[in-house]
Amino acid sequence: MEERPASEPQPQMDTSLKGVVGIQNMGNTCYCNSTLQLIRACPEWNAFCLTQNFTEQLRNVPDDNASKRILLAYQDIIKSVWSAYKPAYVRPLGFISEVRKAVRGTVYEMFGIPIPNDSHEYLVYLLDKFHEAIKTESVYTEIIVDDSANHIEKMRALAENGWNKFISKNKSEVVDRFFGMMRKTIHCTECKNNTYQWEVFNSLKIPCEGHTFQEWIKNEVKDSEIEGYDCENCTKLTPSNKVRHNAKIHTHIWKLPQSLFITLRRFNYDGRKNMSVCPYDGGSMNFTEFFAEESADSSRAWTYELRGVSDHHGSHMGGHYTAQFKHPISNEWWIMDDETAHKQVGPIAGVSNYIFYFRRKSS
């Protein structure tokens, strides 16, 4: 290596190219590379992975724990990516190796075989493993609602109980950063009783239906009907006459995470791919209209900006994954195609968009 005298000016690296680093394809791993580029588009999560707090949380986890080993391998990738400049790329051999060892004999065994896989399924798997490595538990204390409470007070107490019950077993930076909660209201058309279900999620899946991106979301949370609903309230009222009735389901968002993944329902149950052009225009997003009216969660008023996209090019018979990535320093957009990176004017919407990563905009 050539050494320069201390008095000689050192070459200045272009900070806008720092971290614009590809990931080598290790044999049908483009789905993995696209997913990793999507997750690493979240600066707060990556910053956490490099903190002392991160190290402390893993200290008491056995070294042979598969989730810990995967998370540490991800940390290695983040360190390598953000210490390099375009046109460099990283070789994720250690990360791939840890995942392949972890999935043996599990329902995720397909991730250990060098075959094409689904980036959404891989995203859910990685978030789960990251969470498992650092999760903690706490005591769950139920909020008792007074009979004199009004509907809004009762609903907010039920929501808080639903969320607190979940995080009492699942507290982690992953949940804090990536998880939200939906409320489903099941309305029996016979006795008019409402039953509420609280469902946490780390990716909001929406159909490719409508003229605007807002309509695509609206079609996911629109009312639906079910036949043959086994209503507990009807059974209590007429225990000797147990008859199933119809019911309506109303779905609303109750709370959103600061880092929101939205997955398009591109692949149908018969395996075919929906090739609808995504109508998202790249602008800021607000989800207030999809919230339950009783929700007072602060995320109701948040505005989000797009920071990354996982794209699938091709049909259900085969294809290739790439990622779109907004640089956190320069705010320039890049297409990350395995080892290579190409600058672009802005996010590209089309038939290939599969997973969007939205980040809460700072005020």
Which ranges hold each PLM region?
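A broadly conserved sequence feature marking short terminus-proximal activation segments
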Residues: E109-H211
